[in-house]
Regions:
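A ubiquitous short alpha-helical element
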Residues: 30-35, 97-101
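Bacterial N-terminal signal peptides that target proteins for export
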Residues: 2-18
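Catalytic glycan-binding domains that act on GlcNAc-containing polysaccharides
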Residues: 56-278
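Residues at the start of alpha-helices and the adjacent loop-to-helix junctions
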Residues: 8-9, 24, 43
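Short N-terminal segments immediately surrounding and downstream of signal-peptide cleavage
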Residues: 31-52
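Basic/polar N-terminal segments that are highly enriched at the extreme N-terminus
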Residues: 1-2, 6, 28-34
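Short amphipathic alpha-helical/adjacent loop interface patches that line ligand
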Residues: 15, 48, 111
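C-terminal segment of classical bacterial N-terminal signal peptides
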Residues: 20-29
Length: 278
């Protein structure tokens, strides 16, 4: 999913409030600076103290030390292009023959894993592989920007303070839990992580260890990636055995993944192709 799509999903779903619920805490965020003014380093130390007051360990909070404001992130945030395209055009852009062919290969390669995941969560493999392909081309393009720096920059910014301060706290909690190190936390510019692009609060709530190594690793572990994606959909109301096309029960669960009807419908079309439909 593009960064713009992911942000639209959070914002149209009441992202800040949802993030606070997901993060499991309710506290006034550190004061945001007016746009383009203030002292980022000073704000960061205030935020660090607040993070520790919310239970983040001092060792993990120390990863905030020395972070610098990233003007590139703000530029990308300010210059997002929001426009609607007809569904058929969107579908053609996202669902090229190569992506579909590779998806079919992934269905075969991970058939046993996908069966185990469906047995546990009720989400068919074709839906998970469709999301995986659309998000990052099966892990090929998941982003290389340092997530803590990106989230700190956006949390300091005046426009979405509550949303991104929540995300930053939960990114630190993911580190505290032992799933990833700060150095491993690289993703898209708005903080999306892993092969299906979880925001930090979603990572904290829905990411699970499915390969048995003791860590929920959505960057490198395909079992963790696909099972966590299924767990996310289940958390948004996925019903075992129900349909996912528009008007069917699981369409709304897919919209919990992305509020865009074009994107949700594209997941459905892709999944149907992977299942052997037209």
């Amino acid at each position: 999913m593009s960064v713009g799509n992911r942000l639209r999903r959070w914002l149209t779903a009441g992202g800040a409030a949802a993030g606070l619920a997901i993060g499991g805490f309710a506290a006034a965020p550190a004061t945001a600076a007016p746009c383009e003014t203030g002292d980022f380093a000073q704000w960061l130390q205030t935020f660090k103290a607040e993070a520790m007051s919310l239970g983040v360990s001092p060792a993990t909070a120390a990863n905030l030390d020395g972070l610098t404001y990233d003007k590139k992130v703000i530029g990308l945030d300010r210059n997002q292009k929001h426009f609607k395209v007809p569904f058929e055009q969107f579908l053609k852009q996202r669902l090229n023959p190569g992506r579909v062919a590779k998806g079919a290969q992934m269905m075969k390669k991970h058939a046993a894993l996908l069966k185990r995941i469906e047995e546990r969560f009720g989400v068919p493999g074709e839906v998970l592989v469709a999301i995986w392909g659309l998000e990052t081309d099966y892990g090929a393009v998941s982003g290389k920007m340092p997530v803590l720096r990106s989230l700190a920059t956006l949390a300091y910014d005046c426009r979405r303070t509550d949303l991104f301060q929540t995300q930053l706290i939960d990114a630190l909690r993911v580190i505290d839990r032992g799933d990833l190190t700060a150095a491993e936390m690289r993703g898209a510019w708005a903080g999306e992580l892993g092969q299906t692009q979880f925001m930090a609060s979603s990572y904290y709530q829905y990411a699970i260890d499915f390969d048995g190594d003791g860590h929920a690793d959505l960057l490198n572990s395909v079992p963790d990636v696909l099972a966590s994606t299924a767990n996310y959909l289940k958390g948004y109301g996925w019903q075992r055995g129900a349909g996912w096309e528009e008007g069917e029960p699981n369409y709304q669960a897919l919209k919990g993944w992305n509020k865009s009807d074009n994107y949700t419908r594209t997941i459905g079309v892709f999944a149907k192709k992977l299942a052997g439909g037209a």
